Amino acid sequence: MSHADRQRAVRSSAPPLLTARELHKRFGDNEVLKGVDLTLYRGEVVVLIGPSGSGKTTVLRSLNGLETPDAGVLTLDGGPEIDFVTPPSKRTRFALRDRSAMVFQHHNLFPHLTVINNVIEGPLRVQRRPKDEVMAEARGLLARVGLSDKENAYPHELSGGQQQRVGIVRALALRPDLLLFDEPTSALDPELVGEVLIVIKELADEGWTMVVVTHELAFAREAADHVLFLDGGVVVEEGPPQQLFTAPAHERTRRFLTRIMRPLDGV
């Protein structure tokens, strides 16, 4: 099934899993988000692209309560609207986090815990699931990303790519409805980027619901169902990847893609 067919099927089959409308966020004098809208359907991969400082990570963190917008409305899976004009309660923020899991740019593994203990920490301590069940699932997930032999290693004994794969497994172990990736390859050596992108692409092919912030445009073009181009805290343009990458409607989008993709064409 092509991306276009897949997106049409996803977007016509059910109501959105998540809707964000008119998100605004200011840090001091810097208005980072100026009315961002985002709609995400179950089983869909939405990719956010744009220059540094465009607000991509702030959008991502706003979707699971790590950042609280100053204004805007968020609806998750048909639940009650969260209106950020009134700061949400701690319970509401925790409810958002319970439904999602984030893979961070710098891995954010606990340095004093082994790989397996990093993976089982959330399911055991937060979700309070049975240890035997959690251990079996964690080992299965480590096996699928090629890290069975690293379960007793510590993060400092792993390469950056291995650490990020552990970060992905840790997120999957929480059984989230929504996976959030914040530039998961930007802190990696170029030679290690591919191994992480392969894992994320496999998750996309399996139908995981994901929002991904990335500068890897070739990956975005291949894996995304829907792409948003942000600049200056607004969504300049959005659409299916084949449309946005081959025939962007806005001059700003064209300039960004030309500058980013031109060096890649000569590699």
Where are these regions (language model features)?
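ABC-family P-loop ATPase nucleotide-binding domain
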Residues: 1-24, 264-267
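ABC family nucleotide-binding domain
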Residues: 15-241
